[in-house]
């Protein structure tokens, strides 16, 4: 490996995951593809994470260990800190609590070199619990009907307008290899000021710059925790607000998105709002949705009606029908 010009920069952003760090770092260091630098970031953990990271200070792959004195409160600011430190053509944000197969990097690097102007390469993932045991179900939208090919290439802007519009189908950064030169351009993007939906915005903006490759092999293991930040975000309404802001960005980017498709998406947002337990918070979010996107209760009714219309109208748009797939 040329430490000055590695092919891949592996960024491990950590906060209070000392108990998972050694297994995670070994899963990276044991990769069959070894042309990478390792950037270790800690966001002022209160456990012994800094001590664990320090054990790897003299490892040949480790180029940076940065321990914050004060917590940033933003995983996405840590992402960008690592991206700006990175020297590789490609970046892998290997979340500190996840795991991977030994040929994750080898497979992804092969795929991104096979196609033109790739911005993002995503593998299939499985869920694991806090103890590392496999959970039921799959993490990927294609799991119920796997393609009969090993990988597929998609034009980035089309993927953003169809697949990423409905929801963030790239659910875990640990399962992605992406182009650093495109990510650096997002150094002042709005995703940095988000707490919950920043990854959705990041992947969307990456795909506006280059193309997408989906790899249909389970090479990533996405750890699920009993207490999740996303649940807190939904109950407080903050995540839903960020989702609404994300739709504003996407609809401004693609002004030709049809009204029916928009209304279905707004109906999805309204359904999330109805699940918020606090009635006053529901009213606040409904007003925010209306002000930002013109979304209203009738969009939710259309969303439910659409579920029945899809059976008698095979041409009608639905989330699954609108997605690009092979």
What residue ranges belong to the model's regions?
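Glycine-rich, basic loop-to-helix element that forms the pyrophosphate-binding segment
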Residues: 68-86, 99, 107
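Short loop->beta transition adjacent to catalytic acidic/histidine clusters or analogous donor-positioning motifs
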Residues: 5-8, 29-40, 48, 60-64
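Conserved donor NDP-sugar-binding/catalytic core segment of glycosyltransferases
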Residues: 103-143
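A conserved acidic beta->alpha catalytic loop
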Residues: 27, 42-51, 70-72, 95
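Conserved nucleotide-sugar donor-binding catalytic segment
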Residues: 142-239, 243
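Short aromatic/hydrophobic "clamp" motif used to bind/position activated sugar donors
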Residues: 91
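Short, well-formed alpha-helical segments that are part of the catalytic scaffolds
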Residues: 17-30
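Membrane-interface aromatic/basic loop that binds lipid-linked glycans or pyrophosphate carriers
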Residues: 1, 252, 269-326
